[in-house]
Amino acid sequence: MTALNHWQPSADIKNLLKRAKIIAEIRQFFTERGLLEVETPVLSEFGVTDLHLSTFSTEFLAPFGEQSKTLWLSTSPEYHMKRLLAAGSGPIFQISKVFRNEEAGNRHNPEFTMLEWYRPHFHMHRLINEVDDLLQQILDCPPAESLSYQFVFQEYVGLDPLSAERSELIEAARKHNFMAEDNEDRDTLLQFLFSEVVEPQIGKERPIAVYHFPSTQAALAQVSPEDQRVAERFEFYYKGLELANGFHELADAQEQRHRFELDNQQRQKCELPTREIDERFLAALEAGMPDASGVALGIDRLMMIALDCEKINDVISFAMDNA
């Protein structure tokens, strides 16, 4: 098909009209609760160290003879929004375009829309309740169920993810057609088993919040003071889709730097390029970000459920192959 006859939108106009109405409803939800809507840059001088995120880059040509520089397209507005929190913004939300140089398919588009919000002085479970409120309002769905990562993993894999021997995890992964090496990384095994065995079984009839992921998967979340084996991190699943990922946010600049450095060490082991650490973000943590919880929710996947669509292309105006 040539570009001349491949001009029409990916989604039906009626779906785009419904999408606009839902986004307006989301904005009203947060405005009525006293959150400030913010806008942060899509381009940044820093990428992300996360081993599992592939970032788009572009070159700023810097006119007037200045040296050009590489800029990175945002994978999430998280770092900038936390800088706003540290500056005293109070509770904030944002609906923004984000970019990940990864797969395109029925559930993924490299450019997508993310809703992200932060609540100073909220603990993790209070934010889980607010995500639940939003989903019930937008999707008219039953209240969410909250279960620990340890519980659902034991329920569907039959192993305790926090205490199982690596050999047991390898055996379980191989039963599910994962060609695990004898020295396979423990987190790789846990992530495979969770995504391939657990996720397809949960959130079918109602949303489910899975909380207390292993501390080795904390990312930017705090480790639980009650149990150092788990992080104060949660994810929401519904109708076969991962919808949201939230944290009781890590505010310790020294610990965050250490995690970034570990990310880069892992990148080197995997023969991936290292990423420069975002010193501005760490400076904001050092200055004092308030204790807060935050969450990112995929708007396009939310629309897939709200509009009963199987493909992400049916809820966005122009997919990557039609942009």
Swiss-Prot record:
<dbReference type="GO" id="GO:0005829">
    <property type="term" value="C:cytosol"/>
</dbReference>
<feature type="binding site">
    <location>
        <position position="109"/>
    </location>
    <ligand>
        <name>ATP</name>
    </ligand>
</feature>
<comment type="function">
    <text>With EpmB is involved in the beta-lysylation step of the post-translational modification of translation elongation factor P (EF-P). Catalyzes the ATP-dependent activation of (R)-beta-lysine produced by EpmB, forming a lysyl-adenylate, from which the beta-lysyl moiety is then transferred to the epsilon-amino group of a conserved specific lysine residue in EF-P.</text>
</comment>
<feature type="binding site">
    <location>
        <position position="249"/>
    </location>
    <ligand>
        <name>substrate</name>
    </ligand>
</feature>
<dbReference type="GO" id="GO:0005524">
    <property type="term" value="F:ATP binding"/>
</dbReference>
<feature type="binding site">
    <location>
        <begin position="100"/>
        <end position="102"/>
    </location>
    <ligand>
        <name>ATP</name>
    </ligand>
</feature>
<dbReference type="InterPro" id="IPR004525">
    <property type="entry name" value="EpmA"/>
</dbReference>
<keyword id="KW-0436">Ligase</keyword>
<feature type="binding site">
    <location>
        <begin position="242"/>
        <end position="243"/>
    </location>
    <ligand>
        <name>ATP</name>
    </ligand>
</feature>
<feature type="binding site">
    <location>
        <position position="118"/>
    </location>
    <ligand>
        <name>substrate</name>
    </ligand>
</feature>
<dbReference type="GO" id="GO:0006430">
    <property type="term" value="P:lysyl-tRNA aminoacylation"/>
</dbReference>
<dbReference type="InterPro" id="IPR018149">
    <property type="entry name" value="Lys-tRNA-synth_II_C"/>
</dbReference>
<dbReference type="InterPro" id="IPR004364">
    <property type="entry name" value="Aa-tRNA-synt_II"/>
</dbReference>
<dbReference type="InterPro" id="IPR045864">
    <property type="entry name" value="aa-tRNA-synth_II/BPL/LPL"/>
</dbReference>
<keyword id="KW-0067">ATP-binding</keyword>
<protein>
    <recommendedName>
        <fullName>Elongation factor P--(R)-beta-lysine ligase</fullName>
        <ecNumber>6.3.2.-</ecNumber>
    </recommendedName>
</protein>
<comment type="similarity">
    <text>Belongs to the class-II aminoacyl-tRNA synthetase family. EpmA subfamily.</text>
</comment>
<dbReference type="GO" id="GO:0004824">
    <property type="term" value="F:lysine-tRNA ligase activity"/>
</dbReference>
<keyword id="KW-0547">Nucleotide-binding</keyword>
<dbReference type="InterPro" id="IPR006195">
    <property type="entry name" value="aa-tRNA-synth_II"/>
</dbReference>
<dbReference type="Pfam" id="PF00152">
    <property type="entry name" value="tRNA-synt_2"/>
</dbReference>
<feature type="binding site">
    <location>
        <position position="298"/>
    </location>
    <ligand>
        <name>ATP</name>
    </ligand>
</feature>
<dbReference type="GO" id="GO:0016880">
    <property type="term" value="F:acid-ammonia (or amide) ligase activity"/>
</dbReference>
<comment type="subunit">
    <text>Homodimer.</text>
</comment>
<dbReference type="GO" id="GO:0000049">
    <property type="term" value="F:tRNA binding"/>
</dbReference>
<feature type="binding site">
    <location>
        <begin position="76"/>
        <end position="78"/>
    </location>
    <ligand>
        <name>substrate</name>
    </ligand>
</feature>
